[in-house]
Amino acid sequence: MDIKSLMNTKQDILRSNLQILIDHPVTKGDQCESAWIEFFRGFLPNKYAIDKGFIFDSKGNISEQIDIIIYDALYTPLVFCTNSGEKFVTAESVYAVFESKPTIDKTKLEYADKKIKSVTSLYRTSREMISSGKRVGPRKLTPILGGILSVDSVGIDTISKHVNRYKGIDFGCAINNFTFHVRRNENREFLSLITSSKDETILSFFYLILDELYKLGTVAGLDIREYAYATLEQFKIERGGV
């Protein structure tokens, strides 16, 4: 078996698993996020956690409810969980967020963009760290990626027309149609739109997500002191050192 046949088999498995989950009565309709969460958990490395919920910062701001959050599983100290399974995740810990809908169209793109911007507008800290015994300065904050996921979609020409306006959206996947990737410059201005064929939708999305997450590396270390200052009235953690 050659590598192409191997990866095509991987695509068939991913597509089949995702279709089964989405067609299940529990997830059918507008609330398909659990199917996509299981999809991501099925192939992303263990350094990533995937959940639904809210994202908050040290200033007391909270995002809108997010269908799928990909966040750091190793260095995320403040994750709270509701009885319904929704997580509250620190803004510094987030790699990517997604909105899940049955169909992608102009209204859904606008809605997803609004949700994504409720996350990317949050305040994030960055702190010095010790690496290999040496002090390293605070890392530059990495972008928080945003996307939309669905079963079906309007045509790619319509997508291209609107993602120029909705700058929070970096990519999307409609499993019955295509995967798309929006290329932007440092100012989030539209450069081009890359799309997959229908036959390669899932595998293209698989490679795209892995590549984009790899390029981010590891999120910056959050400054826990900022959260302490915001929540403690008497006890204060001293600044200084790392």
Predicted features along the sequence, with ranges:
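Intrinsically disordered, low-complexity Ser/Thr/Pro/Gly-rich regulatory segments
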Residues: 1-65, 70-242
